[in-house]
Amino acid sequence: MKPLFVLPVLLSLCSTLYSQNIQFTEYDLPNGLKVLLHEDHSTPIVAVSVMYHVGSKNEKPDRTGFAHFFEHLLFEGSKNIKRGEFDDYVNEAGGYNNANTWYDRTYYYEVLPSNQLALGLWLESERMLHANVETVGIETQRQVVKEERRQRVDNQPYGRILEEAMKRTFTTHPYHHSVIGAMEHLDAAEEADYKQFYKDFYRPDNAIISIAGDIDIEQTKKLIDVYFKDIPRGQGEIFRPKITEPPLSAELRDTVYDNVQLPALVCTYRIPAQGTKDFYAVKMLSMLLSQGQSSRLQKQIVDEEQKAIAVGSFPLELEDPGANIMFAIANMGVDISDLANSMDAVVADVQKNLVSESEFQKIQNQVENDFVTANNTMAGIAESLANYEMYFGDANLINTELERYRKVTREDLKRVANQYFNKNNRVFLYWLPKPSQP
């Protein structure tokens, strides 16, 4: 009886925790830098982060990979930081740092003891204003990025799934090319190309600084003025591609041969941009299909039919209309056509029948739990605030977006399954071992 008692208590606690709004202060500097500050004295740490509104989407077609390349290059040092010492400052202060790049944005952060707030601000101001964009660092990071691509994409089984799926799903929109980009583009680029990219996008009016943790708001404002106020606003318009991808009119099927032992299936469905009403329904539908051991794909295809060893479905959370990736890796000896039929059958069931009340409630609980988990650290809060501000211009969605999920109904799941997860709206890839190639 004990687990039955504990579960509702935990769910209630999660709901209570999330009902406590995350308070924050927001304002703009005269140079266009958006500032978001969250004060929390529960632990003596602070997360200092800067999000730039630039990703692979903003790259030139013959210079792909620049956004991700800069994620590496901007740890090379600056006018006042020697090469290789950026990380040393953070490590010696007892903190850690990292960065990541996506189709729409690039994100840098440090998590430090709260008495090192000024250090984090200085490091990020150096990155914004004085970064070393020169031949030595460029050549060093070219080799680093090439090795990363070899390890994570080219030589990783199934490592090219996202790349191959997206380049077929999008033909005109820059989501067509991968975030890591083409190595020949990085090789062909000259120092002037990199300097121009830095000038075009690494500017205060294209950035959000988000700080969460053991801070004093007024003192933090003064420190931000010291390190960022005098950085000049960028010149010229920031390049934002405005491209509408034509709709798919029929299913596109293709075959990819890879160095894998087991074949796989990859289905990419076109979906709306994140933040739209239907996106929330699509995300919950994807959770129904693949999140957890009791999800539809897992139960039917992996556990009951034993046709696959791994399954998944996830929407890409993008600024423009994007894609939902669904995949299954076949079990040994399973005919790939049988696996495809089983995947389609799982989707067809959601298209024909309403999800049960109990199953729908479980998804709602998962959504709430995911929200609590995403924002239970200072680093998580800083990133969430920055994401909401960048994608939607509304950082307060950290407190209100959950209501958008709560408005989704069982009927919405059935509707979006038919509208977006239909065969005429997808790219279907057979992922086969290389020896099978004729």
Model region roles, listed by residue range:
Residues 21-40:
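Short N-terminal segments immediately surrounding and downstream of signal-peptide cleavage
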Residues 17-19:
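Boundary at the C-terminal end of the N-terminal hydrophobic targeting segment
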Residues 150, 167, 236-294:
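His/Glu-based metal-binding/catalytic segments typifying zinc-dependent metallopeptidases
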Residues 32, 45-48:
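Start-of-domain marker
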